[in-house]
Structures are given as C-alpha cells and as structure tokens.
Amino acid sequence: MHRVKQKRNSVLVAVPILILCGWGALFLLSRWFAYDPARNLALSLPGMDGGPSGSDRAVTNEVQVNLAGKLEKFDGVPSSLPGSWPRFRGADFDNICKADVKLADRWPESGPKVLWSVTLGEGHAAPTVLNGCVYLFDYDEAKRADALRCFSLADGKEIWRRSYTLPAKRNHGLSRTIPAVTEDCIVTVGPRCHVSCVETATGNFRWGIDLQKEYGTTEPLWFTGQCPLIDNGLAILAPGGSDALMMAVDCKTGAVVWKTPNPKGWKMSHSSILPLTLHGEKMYVYAAVGGMTGVSPAGKVLWEIPWSASVIAPSPVPVAGNKIFITAGYGAGSLMVQIDKTADGFSAKEISRTGPQDWLACEQQTPILYDGLLYGIMPKDGGALKQQFVCYDPAGGEPVWSSGKTHRFGLGPFFMADGKFFILDDDGTLTMLAVSRTGYESLAQYKVLDGQDAWGPIALAGTRMLLRDSTRMVCLEMGAEK
C-alpha cells in the first residue's frame, strides 16, 4: 500500500513538471520562430569598428597640445627636378595637370618604374610638391604625434620633420589632409582639427590653432578631411565652430583677419574650400554639414543654401553658367545650384537634387569637370552604375558613357594629365584610360601598391607621379620614352 501511494505521489509530482517543461518548450519554440536574425544588425560604416567615440574624440579638448613641437633634420636634400603640385587638387583646384608633360601611353609588363618609396603612418594624407620637395602630413603611431614631413622628390630621402605629440586612435587611418604650400609657408590641418603654419624652406614654426578649443569645432567622424587653402597670404579655413563658419588667418603673423558668423550652427565637413569667381566677384565656396555657402574675401556671406548630407567628402565643382555642383555619399546624392546676382545681391537656387541611383554621385573623391563634361566614380548605392567610372553632361539626362560592369572601382582617387585619366583602385591597382567624350577606353593597368585603402589623392610633378596606400607612398616615373 505504501509503494502504491509513493508511486501515485511521484506521478502527481511528475505530471506538473512535464506540463511545465512542455509549456517551456513551446514558448522557446515560438520565440525561435519569431526571432528576426537581422533585427540587431547595424549598418557597418568606416569608423564604426572600434574607432573613437564622440567622448573619445573630445579628449584632446582637455589636453594641452604644444603645436610648435619639435623640428628634426635629416640627410635628404631638395631636388632640382621640375614640376609642382602645390595643394589639394592641384594649382587650379580641378585635379587636372596642365603642365606640358608627355606621359607614356603604354606601360611595360613590369609596370611603371618605381623610383622610390617610403613607409608612412596609417592614413590617407596625400603629398604636395614644390621646388623639388615633397610635403606630406603624416601621423607617427610609435610616437603618437602629428608630423609634417619633407622629402626629396629625387630619391625620397627625408629632409626635415616638424611634429607635435597628440593622442589619437586609429579610425580607418589617422591623417587624411593635404598641406597647402607656397614659396613662403606651409599650412596644415591635422586629424584632430589642429592648424599649423611653418616656413617652407626651413620648417620653422610660425603659429598654430586648436580649432576645437578655440572655436568650438566639432571633429568630423573619421577625423578631419578638410584641406587648407592659402590665398594671397591668408590661410582660409572652415572651422564650422560656434562663432566662425569660415575664417582667414594671416600666414605671417597668425592674426585672425576676419571670421564669418555661424548662426545656423553648420558643422565642419570633410569637404575643402574652393575659391571661385562668379558674376565677376571672388568668393570662397564651402559645403558644410548643414548647407553650402559662398563667402566674400572680407568674410561676408554672399549666398547660402541648405543641404542635409551628413557626411560630405567631395568639394564643390563649378559648372558653366554660374552653377555649382556638390555631391556626397551615404545616400545623399547630388545637388546642382544656380548662383544669380541682382542689384540686391547674390542668391542661390536649387536646380536639381538627385539620389545616387538617379544621376552622378561620388562618395569620397571630387568629380572632374573637363571640356563641359563631369567625370566621377559612382558609389556602391549607385544602382546599375554602382562603382563605375562615368561621364555626364551637367545639363542632366542619361550618362554620356560608363566604364561598364567589368570595370568597377572603389573609393580611390582619379585625376587627369596629358589627355589621360588615372584611377587608383582601393587595392593599389592603377588604371590609365584615354580622356574621351564617346566611351571608356582603357590604355593600361598595373598594381603599383601592395597595401589596401589606397584613397589618398594623386600628385604629379613633371613626369613623377606620387601615390599611396594606407601605409606606403611610391614615386613612379610616368614619362614617355624619348
């Protein structure tokens, strides 16, 4: 009798447990069927892979940075070789070399001749060239320092280096700007919004500005990409700060000559300032995060137009008929603006606003305008034309031509010289093609760099071409055989 009762009690205990287990299994099964595996996935963008957060980026606001730093001298000497590339996008701000140089139409099987190469800190900063010297704003990861480096164009030997200590975490590279150089001075903008001016011949320090500390600049995502402008002895900068959208600084003294108010709170973008003359008046055109504006040589806003792109890397491009074209990636597309002038002043009118699948758009590099046509590389979200090199008539409509599905490119640079386009792909493959109004005509292709993220703009001085990937710069001989 006791055994029967004990067995009955065991059954009474087991049944509820089995019922609970069954309900639990059904609950877990229902959760499994209801689970959306993509629900917690986030869009993966450059800089979101463990790079500095906003609070990390702001840490330098609490650190006193000695921008004078130190100057080191080496055994390199300036070259007597001809040619110059004095600033971002070249002498005329259009990424077209107009010097009378003859470049090879074909390359040997071994590719263009490598004259020299140097190791760099990880980044996308590109060189400028003047008087046989190559200037590049680098980041020394071992010493944790921004460094303006001067090399000989002849052999790549370092001549001098001006550096200052600055903590920074890798965020898809570090330095990514291009110095502006004149016979008198060099102006740089560092990844954390530090501006410096040094003497060109000696590297001696003149002055420096911490845009975050002094003007309330918000450091852009993935560090600063704005390249400085030197114009008539003034450094023209766009802090996008609390009280200075744009400003001019005397290169000799470091004195602020004028500041443009920023009542709308537009922020610094990766775009660079373009000096332009429209309707007979000079102005500085800049695409900030918030909108595009034209500012007079005295710092007065002449016109402005809102634009909601959140990440802007390309610079404005002037188009015939007093128009300006601006484009950006991450779905922003492009904007074409008409600038008019009456007795009451300037005005800006939107002509077209297009998505990346609708018309020409570029994510990282600035399109080239040549002979009335626009050339560029479509972004990944460019629809059927994604990552193709394309040619468009600024008047609108379908593309004049594209490189086709078998010729796609990444975020690397492209520029024009001697009737040819040169396109550097992400993996260091250099493509040369004929400049044409009728179609894509490839002339040669060779992998000239072994690294990755070859995004830094190309420079050409004489027949020597300077290119880089994320950690190495090479100098190639591109001249035609005589």
List each model region and its residues.
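A short loop-to-beta-strand structural motif that recurs across blades of beta-propeller domains
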Residues: 147-149, 194-196, 245-247, 291-293, ...
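Blade-level signature of beta-propeller repeat domains, shared across WD40, Kelch, NHL, RCC1
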Residues: 332-334, 428-429, 451-482
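Residue position within the beta-strands of beta-propeller blades
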Residues: 134-136, 188, 237, 286, ...
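Short loop/turn segments immediately following the C-termini of beta-strands
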Residues: 90-93, 139-141, 191, 240-241, ...
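Aromatic (tryptophan-biased) beta-strands that constitute blades/sheets of beta-rich domains
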Residues: 5-16, 26-119, 135, 147-168, ...
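Short coil/turn segments that connect the beta-strands within blades of beta-propeller domains
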Residues: 131-132, 183-184, 232-233, 280-282, ...
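Extracytoplasmic beta-rich repeat domains
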Residues: 115-128, 143-145, 161-180, 208-230, ...
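Loop/turn-rich, solvent-exposed surfaces of beta-rich toroidal or solenoidal domains
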Residues: 332, 358-435
